[in-house]
């Protein structure tokens, strides 16, 4: 039976990490976490879930950090999660079923990311019921399709130091991608960090455009 690994990078995510790992531990054969410099108890929380924790030097490059974790994973299939995200039971079971079927003809699966927020003016914002447990008090969400489940192939790699994605390499190497948008990853920390986070991403983006001044994608990101 194919094995499923959950792969993550974290830094000071103690506020969110336990809920994330609780939502995936029942379906994961391994959990590999790259820590990029936590000073809180993120590592201790991860250890409680028997995660394999590795220190990953931070180089202002999200793709490099994620690829270091991919290289350490041994499972046939990998599920990328962020610490402020969870799966509900139906989504978790659907992912496990796909892995047990070895992708059912696919090499990568695109799921739906629900970014919970109260900004009703945001493009594609959708309201939710006040008693929706996944919303955790938020009025609605913004849905974005993302590739999060994929075969563990060395040629499948993340690219771009910020707004990193693996889709480009999967397509480049002939991988079959299938959309399974009924599987929802619930993103609870959307918008966290405020101005400090925006400045952090801007610094990385500036470095990218300076290194590739003639690359339109670098400027777009």
Explain the meaning of each model-derived region:
Residues 2, 63-70, 81, 87-221:
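Catalytic-site signature of metal-activated, phosphate-bearing donor transferases
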Residues 23, 27, 35-47, 58, ...:
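A conserved acidic beta->alpha catalytic loop
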Residues 1-23:
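N-proximal low-complexity "stem/linker" segments adjacent to membrane-targeting elements
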Residues 28, 50, 73-75, 106:
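Short, well-ordered alpha-helix to beta-strand connector turns
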Residues 43-68, 72:
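Conserved donor nucleotide-binding strand/loop of the catalytic core
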Residues 78:
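Short aromatic/hydrophobic "clamp" motif used to bind/position activated sugar donors
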């Amino acid at each position: 039976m194919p094995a499923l690994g959950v792969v993550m990078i974290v830094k000071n995510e103690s506020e969110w990490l336990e809920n994330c790992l609780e939502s995936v531990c029942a379906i994961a054969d391994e959990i590999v976490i790259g820590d990029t410099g936590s000073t809180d108890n993120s590592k201790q929380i991860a250890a409680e879930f028997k995660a394999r924790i590795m220190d990953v030097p931070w180089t202002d490059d999200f793709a490099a950090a994620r690829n270091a974790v991919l290289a350490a994973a041994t499972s046939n299939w990998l599920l990328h999660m962020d610490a402020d995200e969870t799966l509900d039971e139906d989504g978790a079971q659907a992912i496990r079923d796909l892995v047990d079927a070895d992708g059912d003809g696919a090499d990568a699966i695109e799921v739906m990311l629900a970014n919970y927020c109260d900004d009703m003016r945001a493009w594609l914002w959708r309201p939710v019921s006040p008693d929706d447990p996944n919303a955790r008090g938020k009025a609605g969400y913004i849905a974005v399709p993302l590739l999060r489940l994929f075969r563990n192939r060395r040629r499948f790699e993340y690219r771009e130091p910020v707004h990193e994605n693996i889709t480009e390499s999967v397509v480049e190497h002939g991988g079959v991608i299938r959309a399974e948008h009924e599987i929802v990853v619930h993103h609870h920390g959307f918008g966290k960090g405020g101005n400090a986070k925006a400045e952090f991403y801007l610094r990385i983006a500036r470095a990218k455009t300076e290194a590739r001044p003639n690359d339109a994608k670098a400027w777009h990101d």
